[in-house]
């Protein structure tokens, strides 16, 4: 009876998650498109529902909600479904919609979709060869084979985003990195833009006058037809007329310059607005957050470097370790185990909420940046694939943030994976991403003033 009640709770929560994913799809991703493929919408919503259910099961594990056997069953069921979606269903439909957009392959789209899926499976399976991600005793058809490979892709994605975010967040929030932009700088750049536009108009007038002169002399009517005529009209000019090709090249160069000047002007206006915003109370608050994240970024890079150099992975969750250090330093009586469980629950909850929110915001921006009416179905399926892999790998990494007694069922469900490898791999990719982001932002910040203030 308890199993039925527990299952009804899980099914109800999954329906709610599915509904939220459906609304997000309709209200955010596809609100500007008339053509909707319901199979894409269902796949996206189901992926979102089962991804959120994994985080729900982590919270239930900490709180002791549901029977232990029920939680284990739903862990297994949820993991099997999400892997079925990520490895079989989503890649197949991505290939199907890609082939459907190619007219030559439209009649044989099912065959070519299967070929694309088999190609994906080959490279997906070969992905596990270079990495020590499995215990040697696992069979080729075991569920651990799929989890391990999905985990590598997801952890790599998480580390790249985390490394860039750890550097970009303080760079964005802190007023220290803002360039000093004045009204004089903006006016000077606008003057250059107006001068460039005047030059473009002047040269286009010269081209129009030259074409009119050629027409009046009968050059247009008498010029040879065909390919040779086209080449001659471009490369040769009538006697007494302007060289239209040369003027057109100058116009193209000036138009490209005008586009750059326009973008630089808009950037200066945005920077000036940020300077004004930084003087407000909310701006000062975000400036403080920027300093906090700067410290966190330096600490994270330092710890990642130490972990890589010493080849170590923490055995104790960060909350318990931090409380133990504080208690030993202050020399006070404190129930470390009791409070570490409650604080870990709050920390895990914050990580889960911020992960879901941050990923949805990123997915929305990414979708609007690259989607079109023809590619939108493929893009949504790619986002569903990224989302599912991201959440599966989050479970792999969030395990270390939990006290040891709560890690047991996750370890049992995920199998005998090499968890230490994933944490070391995350540190390596995070460090590379963070250092690359620092170098990129440094060069961009150093070059920007020179570019804007050039005469």
Swiss-Prot record:
Membrane topology summary: Multi-pass membrane protein
GO cellular component: Golgi cisterna membrane; Golgi membrane; Golgi-associated vesicle membrane; monoatomic ion channel complex
Principal place of residence: Golgi
The keyword Glycoprotein is assigned to this record: yes
Glycan-bearing residues: 180
Gene Ontology biological process terms in this record: intracellular pH reduction; protein transport; skin development; T cell differentiation
Keywords tagged on the record: Glycoprotein, Golgi apparatus, Ion channel, Ion transport, Membrane, Protein transport, Transmembrane, Transmembrane helix, Transport, Voltage-gated channel
Catalytic activity, as annotated: iodide(out) = iodide(in); chloride(in) = chloride(out); bromide(in) = bromide(out); fluoride(in) = fluoride(out)
Protein name as annotated: Golgi pH regulator
Pfam families (UniProt xref): ABA_GPCR, GPHR_N
Cellular localisation: Golgi apparatus membrane
Subunit structure: Homotrimer. Interacts with RABL3; the interaction stabilizes GPR89.
TM regions (residue ranges): 5-25, 46-66, 79-99, 114-134, 150-170, 288-308, 343-363, 378-398, 425-445
Similarity field: Belongs to the Golgi pH regulator (TC 1.A.38) family.
InterPro entries given in the database record: ABA_GPCR_dom, Golgi_pH-regulator_cons_dom, GPHR/GTG
GO molecular function: voltage-gated monoatomic anion channel activity
Function statement: Voltage-gated channel that enables the transfer of monoatomic anions such as iodide, chloride, bromide and fluoride which may function in counter-ion conductance and participates in Golgi acidification. Plays a role in lymphocyte development, probably by acting as a RABL3 effector in hematopoietic cells.
């Amino acid at each position: 009876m308890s199993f039925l009640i527990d299952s009804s709770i899980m099914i109800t929560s999954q329906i709610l998650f599915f509904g939220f994913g459906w609304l997000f799809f309709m209200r955010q991703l596809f609100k500007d498109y008339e053509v909707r493929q319901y199979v894409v919408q269902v796949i996206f919503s189901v992926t979102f529902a089962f991804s959120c259910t994994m985080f729900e099961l982590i919270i239930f594990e900490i709180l002791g909600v549901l029977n232990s056997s029920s939680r284990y069953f739903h862990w297994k069921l949820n993991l099997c479904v999400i892997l079925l979606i990520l490895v079989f269903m989503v890649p197949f439909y991505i290939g199907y919609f890609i082939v459907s957009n190619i007219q030559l392959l439209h009649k044989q789209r099912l065959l070519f979709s299967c070929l694309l899926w088999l190609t994906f499976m080959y490279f997906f399976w070969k992905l596990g060869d270079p990495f020590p991600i499995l215990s040697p005793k696992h069979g080729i058809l075991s569920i651990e084979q799929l989890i391990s490979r999905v985990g590598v892709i997801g952890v790599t994605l998480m580390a790249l985003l985390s490394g860039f975010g750890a550097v970009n967040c303080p760079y964005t929030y802190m007023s220290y990195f803002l360039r000093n932009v004045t009204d004089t700088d903006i006016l000077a750049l606008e003057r250059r833009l107006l001068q460039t536009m005047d030059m473009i108009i002047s040269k286009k007038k010269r081209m129009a006058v030259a074409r009119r002169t050629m027409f009046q002399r009968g050059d247009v009517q008498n010029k040879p037809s065909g390919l040779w005529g086209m080449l001659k009209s471009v490369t040769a000019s009538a006697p007494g007329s302007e060289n239209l090709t040369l003027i057109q090249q100058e116009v193209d160069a000036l138009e490209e310059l005008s586009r750059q000047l326009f973008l630089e002007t808009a950037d200066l206006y945005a920077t000036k607005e940020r300077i004004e915003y930084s003087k407000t109370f909310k701006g000062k608050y975000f400036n403080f957050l920027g300093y906090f994240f700067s410290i966190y970024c330096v600490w994270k890079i330092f710890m990642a470097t130490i972990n890589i150099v010493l080849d170590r992975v923490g055995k104790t969750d960060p909350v318990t370790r931090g409380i133990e250090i504080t208690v030993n330093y202050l020399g006070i009586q404190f129930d470390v185990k009791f409070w570490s469980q409650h604080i870990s629950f709050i920390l895990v909850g914050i990580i889960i909420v911020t992960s879901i929110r941050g990923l949805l915001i990123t997915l929305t921006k990414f979708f609007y940046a690259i989607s079109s009416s023809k590619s939108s179905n493929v893009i949504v399926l790619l986002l569903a694939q990224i989302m599912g892999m991201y959440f599966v790998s989050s479970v792999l990494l969030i395990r270390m943030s939990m006290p040891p007694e709560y890690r047991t069922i996750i370890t049992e469900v995920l199998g005998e994976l090499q968890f230490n490898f994933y944490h070391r791999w995350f540190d390596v990719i995070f460090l590379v991403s963070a250092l690359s982001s620092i170098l990129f932002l440094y060069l961009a910040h150093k070059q920007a003033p020179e570019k804007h203030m050039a005469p």
